[in-house]
Amino acid sequence: KIPLEKSLESFQQERIPHKEWMKVQALLKGEFVRRCENVLSFGNPGTGKTHLLCAIGQELIREGYRVRFYSCNLLVQELLRAKKELRMERLFKKLSRLDVLIVDDIGYVQQSREEMEVLFTLLAQRYERGSLMITSNLPFSQWDQIFKDPMTTAAAIDRVIHHSVIIELNLKSYRMEEAQKQQKKEKQSDGNMVVSDGDSQQVSAGHSSPDGQFEETLCDG
């Protein structure tokens, strides 16, 4: 299922280039789904790839489209089980009912050749029959790490890139930015505590006069 917290409202659109945000606005109309086109989101970890595609997915669901979210690793394991249990055709039939299949983090976890073969079979099965929305930390030039051999890699890229929209999020990690902000706040807080301690020491070095005025205590040395 799509994580509900990854919505369009909670996505920080100011972080991404205007050109990429215009692509998102066009995707929200859903025309790419009717044309069975794909959406590919590339970028470093923590740049909002998953959040963005989940947000688009939620908007498409509101428009009546059938959308399903999978992490790549869990999807591959489900495909592999179906293959071993001789029910691949049934699983593909089930997935074919979806208008959009979101596959998150292709290439994040290294898979065996057999696992990647079932993933390739899925890509081939959905080609021009239903939309895929894919996130990956790896650019196409490194997809041979996923599909293991040049021919399969080229065929996989050909199927997903044909009729596709590519969103590039070459940004600084959002999580890293948040961690740095928190660290900065903590340093500022520590600095304020030091100032406060100094103030309290000055106050403790004096006493109040009977009329309420603060007087400094002088000690003869």
Name what the model sees in each region.
Residues 52, 56:
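Hydrophobic positions on the alpha1 helix immediately C-terminal to the Walker A/P-loop
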Residues 49:
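Conserved lysine of the Walker
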Residues 8-28:
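N-terminal pre-Walker A segment at the start of P-loop NTPase domains
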